[in-house]
Regions:
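Predominantly soluble domains enriched in secretory-pathway, periplasmic, or organellar proteins
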Residues: 24-389
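Bacterial N-terminal signal peptides that target proteins for export
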Residues: 2-12
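Bacterial N-terminal signal peptides
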Residues: 10-22
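Intrinsically disordered, low-complexity regions enriched in Ser/Pro/Gly/Gln/His and often acidic
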Residues: 2-3, 17, 208, 258
């Protein structure tokens, strides 16, 4: 049910909840300087819009019209800009909408190719890599010049392209090709292609750029690739390390901020598997919720939050204790999450109900704070914090 159609009693209850919490328990909320700004940007695939949430005041700021079917979003780490990938129609071309975060308006549109579906930025925030699922390619976009500067051919239906922290490796998951393409982004040369990963999905690259992990979403495994580099004075090529057995339908990998374990959301097994990335071993598997589709680890590496698409509950799991702490009621069809910059709020995107559930993360108050309506079929979110000059 869409939040806009909730009965008035529900909306009144949400309002009282927000007022009560804000008035009585605000010790976990930061004190912001006057020039501080923070916004969460939510792509609404069914509306062709981006909902801008004012994080400081925890309210909807505005809706921005972007391109058709926005599906992904990224924030510049160095400039006050946000980039929205518009997938477009099935047979048409997509684009990137550039949002000026200081004024929250669209300032440019960068044309792409057929059905772009993901975006990743290099550490400097100057180059974007966009997977074009309908063109079997990856676009390389100069974000300062606001134009495509290269295009790499990859496998069939690429769904994600991730750049390593050292910017020396681009890892592309080809869903329909059941494969992973490894590219030298400086030259566009394909270094390796690894098959045998049914429904290859969004990769994770370790912070030291040594390994890539790719969930095989149409199977029950995670592919582990050792990325090219030097061991002593010897150059090592990209190589397949192993295929690890996890649950059925692994769709998302959540890496701890410290680069330690990885948590695999097994959507068809209703479970999460813990992976030790140094040894390529699968530890325990935990029953977690109905159709877990995304995980997010807290900044202190202690908690795992899991969005369950079919249960309307967010699961909270203690990594240190190895146990489920409980759950928080959110909206329908939870599909994406993002922390506020201070980590005191977790924004949960609810695709079916068309809203964002705002959850307080402090142990004393861990609960739903409020619900913010968005456009139709929201699907991705990013947080951007900065100080005005």
């Amino acid at each position: 049910m869409n939040a806009r159609s909730l009965p008035s009693a529900w909306l009144f209850t949400f309002g009282l909840l927000a007022l009560a919490l804000s008035g009585c328990h605000t010790s976990d909320f930061p004190q912001y300087p006057p020039n501080y700004r923070e916004y969460a940007y939510v792509t609404n695939g069914g509306s062709g819009t981006v909902s801008v949430i004012d994080v400081v005041n925890v309210r909807l700021d505005r809706d921005l019209a972007v391109g058709q079917n926005p599906v992904a979003v990224a924030a510049s780490p160095t400039r006050n800009e946000v980039f929205v990938v518009n997938s477009g129609t099935r047979d048409g071309v997509g684009s990137i909408s550039v949002i000026d975060a200081e004024h929250n308006k669209v300032v440019a549109t960068i044309p792409l190719h057929r059905q772009p579906v993901s975006i990743d930025l290099d550490p400097a925030g100057n180059i974007a890599y966009v997977a074009n699922s309908g063109s079997n390619s990856v676009s390389v976009v100069d974000l300062k010049a606001r134009r495509e500067i290269a295009r790499f051919g990859v496998g069939e239906e690429p769904v994600a392209a991730r750049i390593s922290a050292d910017s020396k490796t681009l890892v592309v998951a080809n869903r329909r090709g059941n494969s992973v393409t490894v590219i030298d982004p400086a030259t566009g040369r394909i270094r390796a292609v690894f098959g045998g990963c049914p429904g290859a999905a969004d990769p994770v690259i370790l912070p030291d750029s040594s390994k890539a992990f790719i969930p095989c979403s149409a199977g029950h495994q995670v592919m582990v690739i050792s990325l090219a580099g030097k061991q002593g004075n010897t150059a090592q090529p990209d190589r397949l390390e192993t295929l690890m057995d996890v649950g059925r339908g692994p769709v998302h990998l959540a890496l701890k901020p410290d680069g330690g374990e990885i948590f695999v959301s097994n959507s068809l097994s209703d479970s999460v598997s813990e992976v030790y990335n140094t040894t390529d071993e699968v530890g325990d598997t935990y029953m977690i919720g109905n159709d877990p589709v995304r995980g997010l680890v807290s900044r202190d590496n202690s908690l795992l939050y899991v969005a369950n698409f079919r249960s309307q509950y967010l699961t909270v799991y203690s990594i240190d204790d190895g146990r489920r702490l409980g759950s928080v009621h959110v909206g329908d069809g939870s599909s994406a999450m993002a922390f506020s910059a201070a980590g005191h709020l977790l924004f949960v995107v609810d695709t079916r109900s068309g809203d964002v559930a705002v959850v307080r993360t402090a142990a004393a108050y861990r609960s739903l704070f409020t619900v913010i309506p968005t456009g139709r079929a929201p699907n991705a979110i990013v947080d951007k914090a900065f100080k005005m000059p």
